[in-house]
Amino acid sequence: MPGFTCCVPGCYSNSHRDKGLHFYTFPKDPELRCLWLKNVSRGGVSGCFSTFQPTNGHRVCSLHFQGGRKSYSIKVPTIFPLRGVNEKRTRRSSTKKRQQPNYTPAATTVLVTGLPGQEEQEVLELTAGGAEMMLLSTTAGMGATITNVEGSSAVIGATIDAMGTAAVERGSVAAPSNLAVKLDVGEAHAISTHFSSDASHGSHQQLQVVVVGDEPFPSVDCWPSLLGSDHSYSMSSGTTTEELLRKLNEQRDIIALMEVKMKEMKSSIKHLKVTEVKLREELRQKDKDKVSPMIKSN
């Protein structure tokens, strides 16, 4: 971003963006300059500001002066409400131990096919945890029963009854269905799930769900740990809008300072080129002056 950026740590005012602000250079008077440096490089700020030597490109915006403007009576910036960019901050993540993902084998491929009389069939990707969630989130008014569930390393028996009244509140009756679920893990194990309700409410629909294959997948409680990152500008679950804006402003401030430095370097290069041309011309003139007397003497 072009223009001047306030050099006060934690302030991101820019002359190009903030048209209503004034930007002041550091005074030449030694005493005033010392006071400015002492206030700008205030306690708790480390890094370049500990040995900060301002140049003409460093400006202080009017937000840091009483009354919002520098005057004859107000010559020293004293308002610093923002936190320093380089202040030492304790990282919240350093005190927290990251959870290691617990991977559990789970069947993922689910084939849903219609029984005779139904043409549609569909292939879904589902985990064992997802299948359980699907069973628990069935249409309100249905009863779900899971029996005789066996695995390669454990024997599980459970009964889940999910009852609700949402369908009654909507004034509609859920269509009853029978759902058969089969699990193929290399052994002859099966999960039999039956959803049913009163047969007098309507016709029955039947679906067959076949789950095949094994694939390790992290449990749901480990997902937040997978989203964490050690990068200082990464977005964690606890990142607030103010923190994100502060980080973006820091990046914007760095870019603005780099642009100012690039302009200064370009100006210096241009000045050096002009000086080089002048020196070459002077050398050429001196050589010419030396040769002229020799020619006249001959």
Curated annotation (Swiss-Prot):
PROSITE patterns: ZF_THAP. This is THAP domain-containing protein 11. A zinc finger (THAP-type) spans 6-64. GO terms for biological process: regulation of transcription by RNA polymerase II. One of its GO terms (cellular component) is nucleoplasm. PANTHER family: THAP DOMAIN PROTEIN 11, THAP DOMAIN-CONTAINING PROTEIN 11. Residues 242-283 form a coiled coil. Pfam families: THAP (PF05485). The keyword DNA repair does not apply. It comes from Xenopus laevis (African clawed frog). Transcriptional repressor that plays a central role for embryogenesis and the pluripotency of embryonic stem (ES) cells. Sequence-specific DNA-binding factor that represses gene expression in pluripotent ES cells by directly binding to key genetic loci and recruiting epigenetic modifiers. The keyword Nucleus applies. Transmembrane segments: none annotated. GO terms for molecular function: DNA binding; RNA polymerase II cis-regulatory region sequence-specific DNA binding; zinc ion binding. It is found in: Nucleus. Keywords: Coiled coil, DNA-binding, Metal-binding, Nucleus, Repressor, Transcription, Transcription regulation, Zinc, Zinc-finger. The lineage of its organism: Eukaryota, Metazoa, Chordata, Craniata, Vertebrata. Belongs to the THAP11 family. It comes from the Eukaryota.
